[in-house]
């Protein structure tokens, strides 16, 4: 029953349970379905669901995967074991570990978590304590620099030695900001990851507990992991190396916030014994869209080669309009929408996609 409805590539990914596994999943190729069915298959072999860990990036993705996994386990489980897999975001996993073990640097297990508003306010306070005006020194811009450098495992001292004056300032603010967090027994989102990897790499008890508790590790959207998340995944895999990562180098869009595409491109260097499965069948788009996507993305030389295909219909041709400026683009889109509505198309059947930045 677990393999019903899966294509051959998905079945291979589901049935490959031991050792490192790289699932290269093209857009719309059913990656979540594959991971969920893989979890169910592992449980069907006699492994407790509580020994399975899956980590993704957003609360929405974690919630969807958890709900689908629980539903499938209810249908397929042939044991009295009613435990569930641990499915969370990287940050939620960090909170869990730090509250259980405390940070390696000795900070308490009870701490508050700063949201974006809190961190901005604290950086404003740091600037003011240094005699600087937050109005002329953008706290959000400074926080962005600090966050990117922290996730690259740099230090305030390294920033302060930079030739760029903005980076030198960010290094000084970072030190004051850190003192402010410590005085409040607070951690920001970056700390949840940084202190987690510190814990996993330096605390033998915590690392051994994770290895004993979670025998099978799944990491979603691996192409978007940064250096810290990469090391968390490696530490969790341990000597057993039952690490399944899912991702697609063609969908890497977060390098600006520290994501390192090398993590997925060099997975086979990290784990030479890894099995690689390509999920190339798209269940979402028409043949026209898939063909265009393949032609565009194949120009990228830094990728895992694959060729998406679909068994859906051909679909309408793609049209391209080159506007003179943003206003001309907007005018063109509005006119096309009006034409379609006048011809009987419902407004709710029209979608307009645009970049937020």
Residues covered by each model-derived region:
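P-loop NTPase Walker
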Residues: 1-109, 113, 208, 262, ...
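Conserved phosphate/pyrophosphate-binding and hydrolysis machinery centered on Walker-type P-loop NTPases
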Residues: 7, 55, 87, 112-116, ...
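Conserved helicase NTPase motor core
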Residues: 4-15, 19-23, 34, 53, ...
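Short glycine-/polar-rich loops that comprise or flank the Walker A/P-loop
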Residues: 19, 47-51, 81-83, 239-242, ...
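Coupling/switch/interface segments within P-loop NTPase motor domains and analogous charged loops
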Residues: 116-181, 185
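Conserved nucleotide-binding/hydrolysis micro-motifs of P-loop NTPases
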Residues: 29, 59-62, 91-94, 249-253, ...
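Helicase P-loop NTPase motor core
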Residues: 29-35, 272-275, 280-357
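Residue-level signature of catalytic and energy-coupling elements of molecular machines
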Residues: 10, 28, 58, 89, ...
